[in-house]
């Protein structure tokens, strides 16, 4: 595995780094989307509940 890392060109490393960043960003966005969905559902329940 170390040999593979040594043999990578700077362009390949840059590409891999961008992929890693986009993967983390995608995971973060998915998490936030889930939180917003839950908050929205709670708001609807609170606003629509009649006593």
From Swiss-Prot:
Disruption phenotype: No visible phenotype. Impaired developmental regulatory activity. It is a single-pass membrane protein. Changing residue 38 to S: Impaired developmental regulatory activity. InterPro entries: DVL, DVL/RTFL_small_peptides. It is found in: Cell membrane. Residues 1-25 are annotated as: Disordered. One of its GO terms (biological process) is shoot system development. Residues 16-25 have a biased composition (Basic residues). This is Small polypeptide DEVIL 1.
